[in-house]
């Protein structure tokens, strides 16, 4: 909502004070003082005056007296020093136009200044008159100074006396935004935005804050998000555009194409909240009934097979098709660890106070979900503890995420007899038959120790505990698709508590995500038709070829690598396949029955379709044209066994890739991302696969040692950075991404310099081309994250936090130091910079 529109509607008289309201950033406040993301700042005012106290008897003890706040008495002052209202008893705020808003305190937080009254969140409780304050919904009081009650002079003899103290505070007045609406076209945002910068920061001290400080002030984390970034905003724009597509295709028009009918009916079923609410736990009743009828562990194979198909292989262990590490041209069966409800095995094994608190809250959540399925509180509590015991045992038997980065630790070929010997209690023949597979005699068992522990558990754990475990995982996997009681409980723990997200996302956002997740290439087909032209694909491919040429030149001149290893590296580089925008062949979903009145059923049928499609690959040649992301996705990836880089259409949009912008920021941003994905083929994990995607050591011993030495330099650097509180980056987990960030930006700089070597480049907006390159690089990463979510990512995410992805790279590049005249001794210049590629 712009204030100009508001003045036309409401006849406001304070245009000079409020004309820039849409540009007022909300303050940084504790979580309990945050305003719902449906609201926006209408007005910011400084309140200066007095807090007036009355000497009164304490409640419940008439012999004791204390100063009690009676009322504020303050003037409201605008940014230019003009009077814009009064603040008085109620509490009430009144504008010169006669409009008033009364507030009711919702939450408070201690002021950083111990000598000041607390910060407050108030909700509008009353309105009077039309004008400035008639649309206000929330008020925040922040940045308080003074105003505390007197400490002396109040006793029985002074009963009724008044005393006042001077105070001032900043007040933010909020009103409802114009509701989010579907987009008919994608909005434009430049890849380099000067207003996103903070010129008060020295780029040689903190380049990330210099480049992104303005963005951070303008873009507080929305209340339905655990983090917010440039990529998040682009994702939301894409989602709003997809929303428009889905609303249109959801209309039962007989002229709809097959693809439009599929995605439209799926979306319509999801948006029918009244129908979903009536289902309760009904959509999982068949699964729960099958679990209830289990007589022994011997009956598990059929139930597990069904749930693996319906839950994407999540219960107890994982079973899937994947490329053979020894021969990437074919798919074989993979059996791996699984069965956990928390995001990572470390949540079960760490002994710090926060981890113990999370486990306690998790058990309470499991209990609550079991109660929603009809269990008594006492029985559900007992079952939740048993479930925690099972999952803890599975977690302790699982590899850490760092260990999983070594493909050799995940490569253990076995025949069926060997797999059966690991878990005698589980009949694999029955499991395969129930999964729709014939007899298989070749498996990669990624973690044999896990299956040994699973056998111990199967033999020792009471059947009743296993039934409780299975019921929990059924409802856990399906919670988001059930009635509101399950949706809300699931969000309360995993969203609000674990990640610190104050509010659930609106229904339309979730439904867009579900369509993209289950019918992604159908939705992507329509997205591409409307957003991604051949010119964008051609430009991206041209830049990719330039980055590949830079990497070829880089490999050839590496002083630390032998000629033998260089030849193998070049062979691998020249074998990389570039996938840009969308797949050459679209997936056919026509065999999925989609019912406009059965949302949960649609989800399950789509998941079973995908599960069967994946399992059908076992024993067959690899389809090298397949994509692992849907076209609207705002992301990119490298696949070490496919040896390909993939850039969906969704990420090739402004501000990430900006055809209107000069080359420098585009190379700094998208060029760096292309280089990043290419470098993944040669990071600590990718380098272990050859040009064909096979797990094969093509390095000389001396070159491998030198690579490790250089990679250790990066790990040592990033291991010093703090994520949140006292938690440091797990730099062995993030090593691949950190190496790719650094290598990718070096390659992008080389390619940009080569592409523009015959051009005379001039400064733009006061910045040299080199400076614009690096600012463009930094601004792709502008973003913020809630503390709770940072803790999750410190354990689970192989990416470093955004500020270190920028500063960590820039500090290692002499080109950056030269561009901004930074000197050794400043934070953004490392005395001994790291470089791998």
Where on the chain are the PLM-derived regions?
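Hydrophobic/aromatic-rich, well-ordered segments within soluble, folded domains that form packed cores
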Residues: 43-60, 196-217, 348-372, 735, ...
């Amino acid at each position: 909502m712009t204030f100009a529109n508001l003045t036309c509607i409401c006849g406001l008289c304070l245009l000079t004070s409020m004309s820039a309201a849409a540009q007022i950033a909300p303050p940084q406040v504790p979580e309990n003082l945050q305003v719902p993301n449906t609201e926006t700042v209408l007005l910011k005012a400084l309140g200066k005056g007095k807090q007036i106290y009355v000497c009164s008897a304490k409640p419940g003890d008439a012999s004791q007296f204390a100063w009690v706040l009676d009322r504020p008495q303050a003037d409201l002052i605008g940014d230019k020093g003009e009077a814009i209202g009064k603040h008085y008893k109620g509490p009430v705020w009144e504008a010169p136009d006669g409009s008033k808003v009364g507030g009711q305190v919702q939450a408070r937080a201690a002021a950083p200044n111990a000598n000041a009254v607390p910060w407050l969140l108030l909700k509008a409780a009353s309105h009077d008159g039309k004008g400035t304050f008639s649309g206000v919904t929330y008020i925040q009081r922040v940045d308080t100074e003074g105003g505390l009650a007197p400490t002396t002079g109040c006793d029985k003899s002074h009963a009724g006396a008044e005393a006042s103290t001077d105070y001032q505070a900043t007040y933010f007045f909020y009103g409802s935004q114009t509701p989010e609406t579907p987009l008919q076209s994608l909005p434009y945002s430049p890849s380099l935005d000067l207003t996103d910068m903070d010129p008060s920061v020295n780029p040689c001290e903190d380049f990330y804050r210099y480049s992104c400080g303005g963005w951070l002030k303008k873009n507080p984390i929305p209340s339905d998000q655990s983090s917010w970034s440039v990529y998040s905003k682009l994702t939301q724009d894409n989602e709003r555009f997809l929303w428009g597509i889905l609303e249109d295709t959801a209309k039962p028009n007989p002229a709809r194409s097959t693809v439009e009918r599929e995605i439209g009916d799926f979306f319509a079923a999801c948006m029918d909240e009244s129908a979903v609410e009536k289902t309760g736990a009904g959509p999982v009743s068949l699964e729960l009934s099958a679990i209830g009828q289990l007589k022994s562990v011997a009956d598990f194979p059929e139930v597990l097979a069904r749930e693996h198909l319906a839950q994407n292989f999540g219960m107890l262990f994982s079973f899937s098709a994947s490329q053979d590490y020894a021969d990437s041209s074919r798919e074989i069966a993979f059996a791996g660890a699984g069965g956990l409800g928390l995001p990572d095995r470390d949540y079960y094994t760490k002994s710090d106070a926060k981890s113990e608190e999370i486990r306690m809250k998790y058990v309470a959540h499991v209990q609550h979900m079991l109660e929603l399925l009809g269990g008594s509180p006492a029985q559900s509590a007992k079952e939740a503890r048993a479930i925690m015991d099972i999952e803890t045992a599975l977690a302790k038997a699982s590899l850490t995420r760092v260990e999983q980065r070594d493909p050799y630790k995940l490569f253990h070929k076995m025949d069926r007899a060997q797999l059966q010997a690991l878990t005698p209690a589980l009949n694999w023949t029955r499991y395969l038959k129930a999964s729709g597979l014939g007899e298989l005699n070749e498996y990669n068992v990624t973690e044999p120790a896990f299956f040994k522990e699973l056998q111990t558990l199967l033999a020792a754990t009471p059947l009743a505990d296993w039934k409780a475990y299975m019921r929990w995982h059924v409802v856990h996997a399906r919670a988001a698709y059930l009635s509101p009681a399950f949706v809300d409980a699931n969000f309360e723990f995993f969203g609000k508590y674990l990640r610190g997200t104050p509010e659930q996302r609106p229904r339309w956002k979730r439904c867009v995500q579900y369509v993209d997740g289950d019918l992604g290439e159908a939705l992507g087909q329509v997205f591409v038709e409307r957003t991604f032209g051949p010119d964008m694909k051609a430009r991206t491919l041209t830049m990719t070829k330039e980055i590949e040429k830079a990497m070829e030149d880089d490999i050839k001149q590496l002083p630390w690598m032998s000629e033998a290893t260089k030849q193998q590296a070049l062979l691998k580089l020249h074998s990389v396949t570039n996938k840009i925008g969308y797949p050459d062949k679209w997936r056919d979903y026509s065999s999925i029955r989609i019912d406009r009145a059965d949302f949960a059923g649609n989800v399950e049928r789509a998941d079973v379709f995908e599960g069967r499609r994946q399992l059908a690959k076992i024993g067959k040649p690899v389809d090298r044209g397949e994509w692992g992301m849907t076209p609207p996705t705002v992301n990119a990836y490298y696949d070490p066994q496919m040896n390909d880089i993939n850039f969906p259409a969704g990420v090739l949009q402004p501000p990430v890739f900006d055809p209107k912008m000069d080359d420098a920021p585009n190379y700094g941003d998208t060029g760096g991302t292309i280089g990043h994905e290419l470098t993944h083929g040669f990071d600590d994990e990718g380098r272990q696969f050859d040009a064909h995607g096979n797990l094969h050591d093509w390095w000389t011993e001396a070159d491998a040692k030198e690579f490790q030495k250089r990679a250790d330099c990066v790990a040592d650097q990033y291991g010093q950075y703090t994520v949140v509180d006292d938690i440091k980056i797990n730099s062995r987990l993030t090593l691949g991404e950190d190496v790719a960030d650094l290598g990718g930006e070096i390659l992008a700089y080389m390619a940009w310099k080569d592409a523009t070597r015959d051009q005379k480049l001039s400064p733009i907006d006061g910045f040299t081309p080199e400076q614009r390159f690096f600012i463009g690089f930094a601004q792709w990463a502008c973003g913020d994250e809630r503390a709770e979510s940072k803790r999750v990512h410190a354990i689970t995410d192989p990416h470093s936090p955004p500020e270190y992805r920028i500063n960590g790279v820039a500090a290692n590049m002499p080109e950056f130091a030269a561009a901004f005249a930074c000197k050794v001794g400043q934070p953004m210049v490392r005395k001994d910079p790291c470089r791998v590629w």
